[in-house]
Amino acid sequence: MVDHEGEDSSPTDGFGHIPVLLHRADELLGPALTVNDPQGGGAVMIDATLGLGGHSEHFLRTYPQLRLIALDRDPHALEIAGGRLAPFADRITFVHTRYDGIEDALDQAGLPAQESVHGILFDLGVSSMQLDESDRGFAYSIDAPLDMRMDPTTGITAAEVLNTYSHGDLARILSTYGEERFAGKIASEIVRQRAKEPFTTSAALVELLYRSIPAATRRTGGHPAKRTFQALRVEVNGELDSLRAAVPAALDALTVGGRVVFMSYQSLEDRVVKQEITPRSKSKSPEGLPVELPGMGPEFRILTRGAERASEQEVEENPRSAPVRLRAAERIARRSAA
């Protein structure tokens, strides 16, 4: 969730962030939120990745009768967003959970886990707030403790991964989660270095990565630390496992006519989203039949042509939106009893 917060009428707000693809998200979710009332009366929306609350604030202002369920695993984000969204507190249920906690969040809000929600938004990945907080260890441009936990109250740190994982496991996560070509070489260097001195801060890791990646690749492949930091963050936070559970839970939660928007920032996330929504947007009837068999039709229709990208203008105003891939779907039929 590269959390680009901001007012919908200006590039940035007092928080200094811009919500990514804000107007496109509204364009896609708005019809579902206003199906019964142009002010959002009777509609329930889930912001599965609240962050600093920029997207949520826009929807709460635009639809003054909308009910919002706001999820985030970062207690600090919930605290900041809670203050920001205080004027709308009577319409919000805040839940401290990962985005695969949708079912429990709905239970806390007194709603069933299936077909009770009209709109859901996922803005995946690390938030701008987390990148900008120097003590969190997410940014390779800042020397900081190697933590990388989105919820700093639980779980292992990036330093623990570096200092305790076997060579094979390190190479696996670097290759799988970071799509790093030099995963084996980097893993060997990590094991060699930690035998001399355990990793504690990001500067030592960045220095190692500069040594490990060939100069020719560094010149053309972006910052040498980018892929390794991504891989560590995904491993520390269990991001892909969480997403694999969250997408079907979100689809199940939508009522007929309800819509979901996913904004991914890396190919791994986008692949998970696509793999989950595509099968449920296809007929299950045998090919060649003149009519659709009862209960075998598609549950969803895809609202986007492939994965949409940010416009040149948006990227210019907000460089962190450059990698975004947006997909959206609408429930068109109830889930088959089968």
Curated annotation (Swiss-Prot):
Catalytic reaction list: cytidine(1402) in 16S rRNA + S-adenosyl-L-methionine = N(4)-methylcytidine(1402) in 16S rRNA + S-adenosyl-L-homocysteine + H(+)
Iron recorded as keyword: no
Main location: cytoplasm
Segments of this protein annotated with the region Disordered: 276-297, 304-323
InterPro entries: RsmH (IPR002903), SAM-dep_MeTrfase_MraW_recog (IPR023397), SAM-dependent_MTases_sf (IPR029063)
Gene3D superfamilies: Putative methyltransferase TM0872, insert domain, Vaccinia Virus protein VP39
Chain residues that bind S-adenosyl-L-methionine: G53, G54, H55, D72, Y99, D123, Q130
Known EC number: 2.1.1.199
Compartment(s) where it occurs, according to its Swiss-Prot or TrEMBL record: Cytoplasm
Described function: Specifically methylates the N4 position of cytidine in position 1402 (C1402) of 16S rRNA.
Family: Belongs to the methyltransferase superfamily. RsmH family.
HAMAP family from the UniProt entry: 16SrRNA_methyltr_H
Cross-referenced PANTHER family: 12S RRNA N4-METHYLCYTIDINE METHYLTRANSFERASE, S-ADENOSYL-METHYLTRANSFERASE MRAW
Record NCBIfam families: 16S rRNA (cytosine(1402)-N(4))-methyltransferase RsmH
Annotated protein name in UniProt: Ribosomal RNA small subunit methyltransferase H
Species: Rhodococcus jostii (strain RHA1)
